[in-house]
Amino acid sequence: MQTVAVIDYGMGNLHSVAKALEHVGAGKVLVTSDASVIREADRVVFPGVGAIRDCMAEIRRLGFDSLVREVSQDRPFLGICVGMQALLEHSEENAGVDCIGLFPGQVRFFGKDLQEEGEHLKVPHMGWNEVSQTIDHPLWHDIPDRARFYFVHSYYINAGKPGQVVGRGHYGVDFAAALADGSRFAVQFHPEKSHTHGLQLLQNFIAWDGRW
């Protein structure tokens, strides 16, 4: 039976992610902060919610910045929400925070005066929104283009390499909704809260061999 490690660094609704993974037949799902268990897992999921400063402080305190670099190289790895943002180089949040740097690019604030065609948009971006599949990827299998996923975020990703952006969203500005590089895949939305399409993405992750 394959094992899926959900990295626990004290920030994130980990059990809802774990339950969704179990629901799609992920095998043995372990919510853990044990580096040895994470290293031995067949697949790794890196969720996160909250302020990036607090997240990165805990990630560094636990040595998970180097661990994430290590385990994401050679097995399927999925970053979710702030777990995705932590994989970028830098975030504007909390007066500026350096992140893990696996994906080039910046995490930027939507702004207090975000508008679309003259209409004021609330920040955070919260609710259902379409994701355009800009590049084909195994994790999009059986998910229609422009399917709707559930988002909750005040900061968005401006990716440094367009070729790594496999999904885009729009909320006042265009932003990277999904990034991919080798065995790494990361999403701004919450697949565990996104009903049919979110569960399909998690099922695709469980079936994925990490090649792209």
Swiss-Prot record:
Role, per record: IGPS catalyzes the conversion of PRFAR and glutamine to IGP, AICAR and glutamate. The HisH subunit catalyzes the hydrolysis of glutamine to glutamate and ammonia as part of the synthesis of IGP and AICAR. The resulting ammonia molecule is channeled to the active site of HisF.
Complex and partners: Heterodimer of HisH and HisF.
Domain Glutamine amidotransferase type-1 intervals: 3-212
Organism of derivation: Pseudomonas putida (strain ATCC 47054 / DSM 6125 / CFBP 8728 / NCIMB 11950 / KT2440)
Presence of the UniProt keyword Hydrolase in the record: yes
Keywords assigned by UniProt, alphabetized: Amino-acid biosynthesis, Cytoplasm, Glutamine amidotransferase, Histidine biosynthesis, Hydrolase, Lyase
TM region positions: none
GO cellular component: cytoplasm
Catalytic activity field: 5-[(5-phospho-1-deoxy-D-ribulos-1-ylimino)methylamino]-1-(5-phospho-beta-D-ribosyl)imidazole-4-carboxamide + L-glutamine = D-erythro-1-(imidazol-4-yl)glycerol 3-phosphate + 5-amino-1-(5-phospho-beta-D-ribosyl)imidazole-4-carboxamide + L-glutamate + H(+); L-glutamine + H2O = L-glutamate + NH4(+)
SUPFAM superfamilies: Class I glutamine amidotransferase-like
The keyword Translocase is annotated on this UniProt entry: no
Pathway this chain belongs to: Amino-acid biosynthesis; L-histidine biosynthesis; L-histidine from 5-phospho-alpha-D-ribose 1-diphosphate: step 5/9
GO molecular function: glutaminase activity; imidazoleglycerol-phosphate synthase activity; lyase activity
PROSITE patterns: GATASE_TYPE_1
InterPro entries on file: Class_I_gatase-like, GATASE, Imidazole-glycPsynth_HisH
UniProt lineage: Bacteria, Pseudomonadati, Pseudomonadota, Gammaproteobacteria, Pseudomonadales
HAMAP family tied to this protein: HisH
Active-site residues, record numbering mapped to chain: C81, H190, E192
Protein name per Swiss-Prot or TrEMBL: Imidazole glycerol phosphate synthase subunit HisH
GO BP terms, alphabetized: L-histidine biosynthetic process
Subcellular location: Cytoplasm
